[in-house]
């Protein structure tokens, strides 16, 4: 949404949407608190949305919220609004992927996922860390998907990250090194540094159609 002159392109409206879905059990209980907690934190830091940004509030997650979210995302993209969706559980991202099935994904997460590997368009992987499922790894190599480890990105090794022209950006916060994000779920020592992630994503020449953040 930033033009070559450095000014925001007001034709692209940013719509921030919270989806406070909750897990039934396990270490991610409390995920529903993330959207409002992030809003509170940004207010304390006196961080405001850009002029072309609007806060759409939180989606009502009672009942069949996934169908409602899918319809809303499709509508927003069709009217040239870029939805920035804050989960909630990883199910939130799954709905976004279903709503926009023909778009490639840039996925920043430590472990590769079957559903992302099996999409029609190749996924770009940022910050892979640890042992990957062998069958998933075979597909990544067979399809020549672009990938990088957290260490490669942090050490700025000579790797080429070719961004698709249009894509969905999915950031799962478990990709961040535990030392920089102690409140996130999932131990990831040796994960990517926050400033590295911002730098790498910011340098990608890509028209983001939707951004989804999970794992908060």
Regions flagged by a language model, labelled:
Residues 1-216:
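Conserved alpha-helical scaffold segments that buttress catalytic/binding sites
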